[in-house]
Amino acid sequence: MAATSRCSAGVGWGILLMALAGHVFASAADESGAVAPKPLYRDPIYDGAADPVLVWNRQAGTWWMFYTNRRANVAGLPGVSWVHGTRIGIAESADGGVTWEYRRTADLPVGGREDTHWAPDIVRHEGTYHMFLTFVPGTHEDWSGQRCIVHLTSPDLVTWRNVGQLSLASDRVLDATVLQLADGTWRMWYNDERAGKTIFLAESPDLMTWTDRGRAVAERGEGPKAFRWRDYYWLIVDRWADGLAVYRSTDASSWARQPDALLATPGTGEDDKVHGGHADVVVSGDRAFLFYFTHPGRRPDAPKNDTEQRRSSIQVVELKFENGRLTCDRNQPAHIRLAASDSQ
């Protein structure tokens, strides 16, 4: 009987220890956030969500995602006209970025119904939201259209005013990313297609008046994203099938490219089995999250119909800072909890 009692007591302690361990694990998971689904988001209208940018909506107390909404599921569109004639979609998250719901098309006073809106970036400064939008006049079957970057402002992310077109390096500029430096200066990195699709730089003291500073990165790429994290400035550039190139700087002027790209190797998750493209980064506390898009149908085993080849999904992965480099593991669960942001 004594032996039986000791054995029973051991089992009891074992169960208690397992329960405590499970509680600790659950608490840690709760603190780091819930696991984001794969894919994180698909647009319910055109199924063509791409080029995401996230911003904290102070009035609503929720996170908003603005994104290029390509017309992926519209049949009979010739050439690349399905990526033209597009508007910017808006999705909303009330749980710190875990789940997203479609809200509306952004009402932007730029061009007409046949024109094209791409790849917005949004920053908040002194109570005003500033959007820098890529505008392409018209709808085109090829990539021949002009591109420019247009500045808009809003008090609430809903009602926008067109401030005007920026005077930059050429008539084929796109994909702005804007960041304020430690000294208060604003910088914009963007893609100039007239210069071999390399990344150029413009500078402003107030977000209103911009001076072009020429080429910032010599390598080809598009969709740059600039941010500050772990005492460095970072610039992530979409290099298509080669993944996302990562550049690091101490002054946001001289950039060193790390050897390995992000998201070049296809993942294993749903809609994530291809390389990742055109990303946004949200720094939340001491963590950073990479939001990117994929073309899930562009893999060897996928159907070759137009809709499957064209559709796109938004995904998220947490960035890590390891030995001075940025890394991420898209195959691991992404626990996410975006805090209310004072900087956006």
Give residue ranges: language-model regions.
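Bacterial N-terminal signal peptides that target proteins for export
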Residues: M1-G14
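Carbohydrate-active catalytic/glycan-binding domains of CAZyme proteins
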Residues: F25-Q344
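Bacterial N-terminal signal peptides
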Residues: G12-H23
